[in-house]
Amino acid sequence: MRCDVVVVGAGPGGSMAAKTAAEKGLKVVLVEKRQEIGDPVRCAEGVSKARLSSMIKPDPKWIASEVKGARLYAPDGSNVVMSEDKSGDEVGYVLERKIFDRALAMDAARAGARVMVKTRALDLLRANGSVKGIRAMRYGEIIDIEADVVIGADGVESKVGRWAGIDTALKPGDIEVCAQFLLYDKGIDDEYCEFFLGNELAPGGYVWSFPKGEHLANVGLGVIGSRSEPGAPVKLLRRFVERRMPEARIVEMVVGGVPVSGPIERTIADGVMLVGDAARQSDPITGGGILNAMQAGMIAGEVVADAVSSGDTGVEGLMAYEKRWRESIGKQIARHLDLKEFFIRLSDDDLNKLMHSIQSEDVSKMDLRGMLRVLIRLNPKMLWELRHLVM
């Protein structure tokens, strides 16, 4: 089989890359190792309304609910409320990822991409030292898919990057180990996402609740890998639910890992590009990665079209991708990495003090940067080293 570009992984980033490249006239193959795209769901499913709408038209079929904003809780229960449009990239719509991911893959197919499920990439094909496609297993048969460029959108455990010689290694402190329940509870607030901080609740991470309507919610937590033990996230999550939602009924459970390392040093090689979690483009504070992956996927699709058209699919031909995604989303990722590294060092007493300090402030219309500016003003001794983030 021969094509211009093969995309490995049909998550949001991979599907957007495939769709964009196909719209530019390339012959595209999108492969997915699972037989059902979007399943299992491994995230809280929240996205910003404005940012999502800037990339695709929202469709009620894949929107589970809309929220008014977010509540952020300190360990002692004190909290602040932020409006939806100021709460970051994970608050606004709560998606049905199983439907959403398939819809994005269908959009890629409508644009002209060939979508191949139950197709697992096994290795890269090489010719004269250059990457020229992938070898894959499909329905028990080994197949070769020749291509000028391989886009690796194969998630946190990306093999494409490793095969291409890109260092994608993660240290324990670079990953949040997560567990999540889809549960029913009459006490779920269907209008607000909720975030709970505290080292007793989730060491180096936080607990989240994303309402999906009719008192269903994704309730989960992440624990920084360097402070986790086998099975700890599930145990901690069960304890949280038992204490806060004793009448809850668990419908589904998923576990996984999210990179919070900040971007890897390079996301391209000769004939190879990495997108989304494979490139460590998720937000280091929240772990959210849907929108960053989609934006990076669109950039990758545009750049690969130019590279194939020019006949230069080596590092120089793909360098525009590296530059464009770092300029558009990389700066915020870098700022949030600094914040993450600082806040995971704080004690619960520190977190309580910070929350108490802004109780009298109207933060409902502040974004994260604005809130941080106020916190630094009110707590200069504790937060002075973060002042460069709000300059």
From Swiss-Prot:
EC number: 1.3.7.11
Catalytic activity: a 2,3-bis-O-phytanyl-sn-glycerol 1-phospholipid + 8 oxidized 2[4Fe-4S]-[ferredoxin] = a 2,3-bis-O-(geranylgeranyl)-sn-glycerol 1-phospholipid + 8 reduced 2[4Fe-4S]-[ferredoxin] + 16 H(+); 2,3-bis-O-(phytanyl)-sn-glycerol 1-phosphate + 8 oxidized 2[4Fe-4S]-[ferredoxin] = 2,3-bis-O-(geranylgeranyl)-sn-glycerol 1-phosphate + 8 reduced 2[4Fe-4S]-[ferredoxin] + 16 H(+); a 2,3-bis-O-phytanyl-sn-glycerol 1-phospholipid + 8 A = a 2,3-bis-O-(geranylgeranyl)-sn-glycerol 1-phospholipid + 8 AH2; CDP-2,3-bis-O-(geranylgeranyl)-sn-glycerol + 8 AH2 = CDP-2,3-bis-O-(phytanyl)-sn-glycerol + 8 A
One GO process term, biological-process aspect: membrane lipid biosynthetic process
Top EC category: oxidoreductase
Keywords from the UniProt entry: FAD, Flavoprotein, Lipid biosynthesis, Lipid metabolism, Oxidoreductase, Phospholipid biosynthesis, Phospholipid metabolism
Top-level division of the source organism's lineage: Archaea
Cofactor detail note: Binds 1 FAD per subunit.
Alphabetical list of InterPro entries matching this protein: DGGGPL_reductase, FAD-bd, FAD/NAD-bd_sf, Geranylgeranyl_Rdtase_fam, Geranylgeranyl_reductase, GGR_cat
HAMAP family registered for this protein in UniProt: DGGGPL_reductase (MF_01287)
Purpose: Is involved in the reduction of 2,3-digeranylgeranylglycerophospholipids (unsaturated archaeols) into 2,3-diphytanylglycerophospholipids (saturated archaeols) in the biosynthesis of archaeal membrane lipids. Catalyzes the formation of archaetidic acid (2,3-di-O-phytanyl-sn-glyceryl phosphate) from 2,3-di-O-geranylgeranylglyceryl phosphate (DGGGP) via the hydrogenation of each double bond of the isoprenoid chains.
Extra facts: Reduction reaction proceeds via syn addition of hydrogen for double bonds.
Name recorded for this polypeptide: Digeranylgeranylglycerophospholipid reductase
